[in-house]
């Protein structure tokens, strides 16, 4: 699995390469590799605008790109960014301004597979800053709720795509 994240301007920096590695580790888990032996998947991501949740957008875009390319997946992925503000407030899908002022930022990647309790399973998580265990659990719950909306968006997008193809 190869992911190339191209910044909006200039050459890729160290932080861009770290983002690429995190996207690869999340997306690789979703690909059904036994059906694609000795195959390399390459996803090219071009940053158009960074509203603050670039990494989550990259994971979600990669998942949709693989789905659109008819790559067999074990599950779909939904990535959500949550920040803890200096005041202790939780925000999902923060802007870049909110992200820069946050005490901690957390990225959660969920699979469409459900756990025993019926919710999506956590594939990976990344944290920047300090967060208490209680705040981590609250952030996870908020991200879980947001991931359900992302999976619903996937369903409607795929249904629209197939209805257009069937009518053509």
Regions of interest found by a model, annotated:
Residues 1-168:
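Polyanion-binding surfaces on beta-sheet-dominated domains and ring/shell assemblies
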């Amino acid at each position: 699995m190869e992911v190339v994240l191209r910044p909006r301007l200039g050459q890729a920096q160290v932080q861009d390469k770290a983002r690429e590695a995190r996207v690869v580790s999340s997306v690789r888990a979703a690909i059904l590799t036994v059906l694609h032996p000795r195959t390399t998947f390459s996803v090219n991501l071009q940053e158009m605008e960074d509203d603050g949740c670039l990494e989550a957008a990259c994971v979600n875009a990669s998942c949709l790109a693989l789905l659109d390319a008819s790559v067999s997946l074990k599950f779909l992925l939904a990535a959500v960014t949550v920040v803890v503000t200096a005041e202790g407030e939780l925000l999902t899908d923060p802007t870049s301004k909110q992200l820069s002022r946050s005490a901690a930022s957390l990225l959660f990647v969920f699979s469409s597979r459900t756990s025993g309790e019926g919710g999506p399973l956590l594939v990976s998580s990344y944290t920047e800053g300090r967060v208490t265990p209680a705040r981590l659990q609250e952030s996870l719950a908020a991200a879980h709720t947001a991931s359900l909306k992302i999976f619903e968006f996937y369903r409607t997008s795929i249904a629209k795509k197939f209805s257009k193809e069937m009518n053509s």
